Design a protein with these regions (language model features):
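Long, aromatic- and glycine/proline-rich binding clefts that accommodate carbohydrate-like moieties
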Residues: 337-390, 394-395
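Short, polar/charged alpha-helical segment
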Residues: 49-71, 388
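Short, well-ordered beta-strand elements
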Residues: 37-49, 70-75, 99-100, 200, ...
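Hinge/lid segment of periplasmic solute-binding proteins
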Residues: 105-160, 193, 214, 287-291, ...
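Glycine-centered hinge/linker elements that transmit conformational signals in sensory
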Residues: 187-190, 194, 223-250
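Short, low-complexity disordered leader/linker segments with a strong preference
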Residues: 1-43, 65, 408, 412-418
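Extracytoplasmic "Venus flytrap"/periplasmic binding protein-like
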Residues: 62, 66-136, 173, 266-267, ...
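Extracytoplasmic/periplasmic substrate-recognition and gating elements
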Residues: 66, 88, 280-341
Length: 418
């Protein structure tokens, strides 16, 4: 069964992944090398560590075994902040950029507008080397790779948010996992009243805020009124719960998987990629339940793979072949099983091999990846996204705060960024 399409979210994503200035270079079909006949080396900057890097290396070795003329040199940049910083610094000297990189879309906006990133549309549709099954890539992931109406990346390591809950506790109270935000508040309130345990919380306040307003039909961009009704509702929904004791924030714990494991919070919204931390923390003390995010629209997170236009024609084709391999169904099954990331292919999400791999989250991810959205990739988007967390934390840390004046100050902050 195909994943359900969310027309509104997809349309917004495609229309809003835009920037100012020029667009990236356009490759025509006649420019594309369709066969690698001589040895070629490509470099790949990434920030994968631990089990992620082990799986990446394993898959890369398998690719090179199948493609004798292509050498892929993996260059670990240590962390996402370090990778972003190096990419930004190196854009001033395009000849020093790698062949391809792992990156978030908002990192690449200026590079795309400066013509430094290869548009992949002609490669994807090429009769000789193109994707035979590009539509199999989850739509919500594909839309995030489009900037200025062109495809500049292939989805790679993806995640979304899920509801983690203490199933033993909820079952004992005769409660079911909530499927809407209203139900989440009701169940959380019941848990708190019956047991004294905090009902729920959200790991990422920026995700909470932007997801809430998206489900209200709004888009978090320069035209959104952060003092308006949707913004007020987002703030007050969480604030009411904090005031009454049935919601909490992660705060100094950073992630709610710790309080969840220690049974001081009954439910929390967090990434599917955090499963190993949840399972190891709980360590069998109670049965863990997991369910899709309790709203129609869910945020998609994670990086995509971009190819730089400074590469030679042969390197571009070699890089594209590598992208195809890394996002093939077989590779995605391996990658998702090894790392806990969401496979980017619908066929893998639907497969029994994936659903029965022993993970708690795999049986529900087909449903959990319906209605995915991405925040608009526009100038200032990353900074304003982070500011939303600062705003939320400031309000939730002081339940006596004047919300209206705080949102007015938030509006002024955003006006200086957009």
């Amino acid at each position: 069964m195909k994943l359900a399409k969310n027309l509104l979210v997809s349309t917004l994503a495609l229309g809003l992944l835009t920037g100012c200035g020029s667009t990236g270079n356009t490759t025509t079909s006649s420019d594309i090398v369709t066969e690698i006949t001589e040895p070629v080396e490509i470099t790949f900057w990434h920030a994968m560590n631990g089990a992620q890097e082990e799986s990446l290396t394993k898959l890369t070795d398998a690719f090179m075994a199948e493609n004798a003329n292509i050498t892929v040199t993996l260059q670990n940049q240590s962390s996402y902040p370090d990778l972003q910083q190096k990419l930004t610094a190196t854009q001033a000297s395009p000849a020093n950029l790698p062949t391809l990189t792992q990156a978030y879309p908002d990192w690449m906006l200026n590079a795309v507008n400066d013509g430094l990133v290869l548009a992949l549309d002609e490669y994807i549709t090429n009769e000789t080397i193109g994707f035979d099954d590009y539509e199999d890539i989850v739509e919500g992931f594909r839309t995030a790779t489009v900037i200025n109406d062109k495809t500049y990346a292939i989805p790679f390591n993806k995640s979304t948010e899920l509801l983690w809950y203490n199933k033993t506790l909820l079952d004992g109270l005769g409660l079911e996992a909530p499927t809407t935000l209203d139900e989440l508040a009701t169940v959380a309130q019941t848990v708190q009243q019956e047991t004294g345990i905090v009902g729920a919380g959200f790991d990422a306040l920026s995700n909470y805020y932007t997801t809430y307003i998206t489900n209200e039909g709004e888009v978090y961009d320069a035209d959104f009124d952060v003092t308006g009704q949707a913004s007020q509702d987002a703030v007050n929904y969480y604030l009411d719960g904090v005031k009454e004791g049935y919601f909490r924030i992660a705060g100094t714990d950073k992630y709610l998987s710790g309080p969840f494991a220690s049974e001081t919070v009954a439910m929390f919204i967090g990434s599917n990629a955090g499963e190993s931390f949840v399972v190891s923390g709980v360590d069998g003390k109670f049965e863990i339940g997991v369910a899709p995010f309790p709203a129609k629209n869910k945020i998609q997170q994670g990086t995509d793979l971009y190819v730089f236009d400074s590469a030679t024609a042969e390197q571009k084709t070699a890089a594209f072949e590598y992208l195809k391999f890394m996002t093939s169904a077989e590779s995605q099954l391996t990658w998702a099983t090894d790392t806990g990331y969401v496979p980017v292919r619908t066929s893998v999400l639907e497969s029994e091999a994936y659903k029965t791999n022993g993970s708690l989250v795999t049986p529900i991810l087909e449903e959990a990846t319906q209605g995915l959205f991405t925040n608009p990739v526009v100038e200032g988007a990353n900074a304003t996204y982070k500011e939303s967390a600062t705003m939320m934390e400031g309000i939730l840390a002081d339940p006596t705060i004047d919300v209206a004046s705080h949102l007015e100050a938030f509006k002024n902050t955003l006006a200086s960024i957009w």
